């Protein structure tokens, strides 16, 4: 049994929300990134990711399910021919939302929603190789910097003491000078 979506309808009725999300998804798949209000971007993210999941499966049934929502056949072809295969190795997280400055006219919070185009999935062997390399580097690195840091720390303490000594001398000279002027100005009885 169909149940209505909870929460606000993004400026209208349920049918308006469906049309709005379909149009936003069409623009997203056509251009790769769009700028819209933040609530619309947050509503579009799961909608678009479900459509991309259908495109990854690539069956006729999935194509017809997407065509129910997106009416532009060229965009659906792009979705199934390019976007779906690109995300074949990725398990979700196909879109990214980046907040940008508010809209000038009404100060509405704006965001850019875009398709993630970087490959982030790595093989376990590659990941294990990088972990070993980082552990080896971290074991070799601490012995040298600690030895180098100790003399540097001693030099820094000596430099701050040297800087503090002239400043203290200047302060006492200034205090003495002000005491002399106070004595000259004081009335004598």
UniProtKB/Swiss-Prot annotation:
This is Large ribosomal subunit protein bL17. Belongs to the bacterial ribosomal protein bL17 family. Transmembrane segments: none annotated. The keyword Methyltransferase does not apply. GO terms for biological process: translation. The keyword Lipid metabolism does not apply. Keywords: Ribonucleoprotein, Ribosomal protein. Pfam families: Ribosomal_L17 (PF01196). One of its GO terms (cellular component) is cytosolic large ribosomal subunit. GO terms for molecular function: structural constituent of ribosome. Residues 140-180 have a biased composition (Low complexity). Part of the 50S ribosomal subunit. Contacts protein L32. Residues 125-189 are annotated as: Disordered.
């Amino acid at each position: 049994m169909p149940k209505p979506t909870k929460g606000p309808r993004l400026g209208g009725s349920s049918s308006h929300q469906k049309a709005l999300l379909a149009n936003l998804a069409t623009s997203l798949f056509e251009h790769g990134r769009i700028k819209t209000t933040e609530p619309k971007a947050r509503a579009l993210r799961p909608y678009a990711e479900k459509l991309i999941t259908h495109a990854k499966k690539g069956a006729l049934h999935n194509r017809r399910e997407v065509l129910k929502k997106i009416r532009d056949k060229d965009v659906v072809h792009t979705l199934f021919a390019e976007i779906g295969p690109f995300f074949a190795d990725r398990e979700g997280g196909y879109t990214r939302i980046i907040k940008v400055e508010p809209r000038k006219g009404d100060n509405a919070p704006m965001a850019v929603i875009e398709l993630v185009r970087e490959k982030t999935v790595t093989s376990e062997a590659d990941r294990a190789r990088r972990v070993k390399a980082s552990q080896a580097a971290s074991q070799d690195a601490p012995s040298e910097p600690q030895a180098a840091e100790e003399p540097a720390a001693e030099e820094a303490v000596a430099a701050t003491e040297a800087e503090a000594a002239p400043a203290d001398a200047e302060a006492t000279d200034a205090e003495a000078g002000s005491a002399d002027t106070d004595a000259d100005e004081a009335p004598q009885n």
